[in-house]
Amino acid sequence: MAAARWGGGGGLPIGACLLFGKTAGVFSYGDHGTTFGGNPVACAGGVSIVERLTKDLLLEVQAKGDYLKTFILKMKGVETVTGMGLMLGIKINSDKSAREIAESCLRKGLMILTAHDRLRLLPPLNITKTEMNEGLKILNEVLAE
């Protein structure tokens, strides 16, 4: 199994190649590399994230995602909000493209991502309610323009 995640190392990119069973002995040390693998700082961040992953944290993340969805669905032009936890996709019905909306948000201090015609939110798991409210305010202002 291969895994790579931008931000999985506590905000830093990290990657891994995990081998099991018959494949466990296929690679020797140094035979294989990864763009995001082996960085000691990212690895320390990744270990910290894994150590903090508890049922309570995941329930908190789900609650934060539900909070965001509730407010985003009330915003002008929002058709749907999909996703799980804090990984959210927002389908917009607007004359502006998702990219234009994201650029307007960035100018006001909110960095969001896009995927084709959708806005994507990927805040850190430890985002505070105050930070969520600041982001929701900016997104609401931009969508209302």
Outline where the language-model segments fall.
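Conserved N-terminal phosphate-binding loop of PLP-dependent enzymes in the Aspartate aminotransferase
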Residues: M1-E145
